[in-house]
Amino acid sequence: MHPLREIIKDKKLLSGIADLHGTPSYVYDKDRIKENVARLSNALSKNFENFHICYAIKSNSNPHLIRVMHESFPNIGGDCSSPGEIYAAELSGIDPSKCIYTGNYESQSDLIEALNKGCNINLDDITSLDRLKKVGLPERISFRMNPGFGGGSYSGIITGGRDAKFGIPAEKIVQAYRNAMDLGIKRFGLQCMCGSGNLDEKFFTEVLSAILSNAVRIEKELKINFEYISMGGGFGIPYQDDQIALNFDRMFKNLSEIYYETYSDKQSAPSLWLEPGKSIIADTGFIISRVTGLKESYKNFVGIDAGMETLMRPALYGAKHRMYKVGDHGNNEITVDFTGQICENTDRIATDRKFPTLSQGDLVAIMDAGAYGYSMSHNFNTRPRSAEILLDKSSFKEIRKRETIEDIFSLC
């Protein structure tokens, strides 16, 4: 059962949010955020001598949510890929020195911002170093390695392998560090991120093994010692009832055995860095949306006020999100497509979904929208973006106001 299923059954609570703040609205559960942070940090602390969590701010940059993570685990850092994400980290109370900055095809202005803020700069290519040296050099640097393979729940979120635009091929990675050494840099990290949404523990074993074998090769050839090794993120969550969540305790125990086979002196071993996003925030958030129309055509369509402008993942990746009727689930089911109000036929939140009978005005919940939900929402058809609400047991507060049409045109 979904961890927030009981909340979705509370029709009084969610109707109250909808009546006060309108629909569609993103709703996040504070307790679930804290549970996810604790589950990850506890598994790491039991198995690794030194580790650092950099929350992937791209997944959801709302500072109110990041502050909950920061309060739960004060040492948390940020995985940033733009100046805006550095700003979000600072706004949330995270010092940029605890953040890793990984751009790709970076502009000089982006590099200047990351450098001036004191982020741990992770470069995507050897040419990035050429751009960086024109504006300044940090004391420590890392490079993103592409190990030649990747994996993800959808092809569009595989970030390693021969088709990926990211990282330096493993066969060229030594030269990147050699170039950095020639510029006088003496402190180094190594980073790799191969894909997102993975639920197979063996995949992470394969990734870490590839990173470690290359780390040893680089260290021996160049006579350097890595201060940290980041295996990125990519830890998936179950988006469907038949999917099984990652067992962090078991997985990090297995990964630590591989890690300390390579670095047997735990005290001097590089710190393990992670860059999780979905595994912290995805299942904490859902969208409440109101049924606006019912159509019997060649198919049965349920029109709702949340569309691809609200949640882009189904249209972009073919992603599937669980949906529930708010309140009493009911027994009668029909097969329907859920569609928004956008003038594109790809505007489907769900397709051929068996669902309880609905009436106009009913509320539905679109689950697991906490990651890459609001952060990927947009204004197509000049639709204002949703409000965001933080739920703390039976109380709630608005943490982002609903955008207005006037807001959209305020910079024109």
Residues covered by each model-derived region:
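A charged N-terminal "starter" segment
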Residues: 1-120, 126-139, 180-182, 186, ...
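Active-site-proximal loop/turn and secondary-structure-junction residues that shape catalytic pockets
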Residues: 57-61, 84-85, 105-107, 125-127, ...
